[in-house]
Amino acid sequence: HSGKWYWEVHALAIDNDRPNLYIGLDEGRVLDHRIINTIGSGAIATSRVYQSNGNGTKTSNNESAYGGTWSDGDVIGVMVDMDAGKVYYRRNNTIESSGAAAFTIDVNTSSFIPSFGVYEDAASADGGNVMTINFGQDSSFAAGLTSVGAQDENGIGDFKYTPPAGYVAFCTKNLPEPQCVPKDNFGIVGYTGTGVNGAAENVITGL
């Protein structure tokens, strides 16, 4: 639970009449396809999201003012500071709400996963929302934009905008090398025998 991580979302099409897009985090232990309940009346308590319709952030059923209303073509940058337990957003390379954190997360008690989706309530139609996520693999967002090739401070990633200082692409290339590797800590044991029951018929060889 450490480090500062960055990824981007291209809001290709926005329909804010309802439903609306959301980008955020959910606790990794929650096995559910939703961040926010799709009927709007019992939102999952572990969700923390930024909404496209101008209603700010949403944590469970509580909304707080933050940022603004998204438009077609906006690129939302997500900045997760696991060291400080805070999450920030940029829209078209401008940080939202004058740099205030969108919400806080408790990194000591929970694990979080990036999550994306549509929030709707019982009165919502299906809408026409489309978004593409870039963890540093393609700044064109599958040919939706002109490729830029911005990288993090480690020279990793292909982003629309350069990640802020200290933030790196949320990908395996930026993870530390594991201290415990199979070749140093595990051995292979082979068993040969005649197929007859009894330990005396089996020969054990370590490789």
Residue ranges with predicted function:
Residues 1-207:
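PRY/SPRY (B30.2) beta-sandwich protein-interaction domains
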